[in-house]
Amino acid sequence: MAKIEEIDKTRVPQHVAIIMDGNGRWAMKQQHERLFGHQSALTAVRQTVEGGVRLGVKYMTLYTFSTENWNRPQAEVDGLMELLVKAVLDETETLMKNNVRLTMIGDLQRLPERSRTMMERCMTETEGNTTMTLILALSYSSRWEIAQALKKICAEGITPENVDEETLRHYLCTSDIPDPDLLIRTGGELRVSNFLLWQMAYTEFYFTEILWPDFRQDDLCDAVLEFQRRQRRFGKTEAQVEAGE
């Protein structure tokens, strides 16, 4: 496993996005209910955020709860919403200590009022922090995001000939956030699950078999080290990139 000291800090991805997969399977392996896996995942979140701060990552987006997750058993959904409130209450002090700003993206009106209120309180308390921005994707799906962006464009009377990539980007939830440089997905699945589809056009993907509750700072370093081994071309040839064109 790579250590933080082994990472070239001048080539750290500015924005790391993470699909935190495997909580339920981890819990079943421990012969517990799925919610136990979500509760145990908080250690992985804390370790990963603190690791990102130490590495110099400026933005980290965690796929926390998708719009499709509303279809899960009601007891699990209710437990997740309560866990979200508890996590925010417990971690605000740590976010302040690490100078991390918290923000959210997604269809937030679907969240229970108590969950939304506590999240907004934490966002207000941390809004002046500058070391890292931690983005929680809550009640989020990329297709929903793109659809709501198009609705806003139509509502403002913008004509088709005046719509380009930058227009659409302006109306996305992430308009003030750079696109992810690196996507990490834990749990062994090889898909992006309706997450940041527009934003990940040139993102490097890293998949690991590690279930999310077992993910630690050294695992984050492994992903970043693999990212640093790759050549990002953005449509150019290898020769052009090496020539600095």
Residue ranges and their predicted role:
Residues M1-E245:
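Flexible, compositionally biased loop and terminal segments
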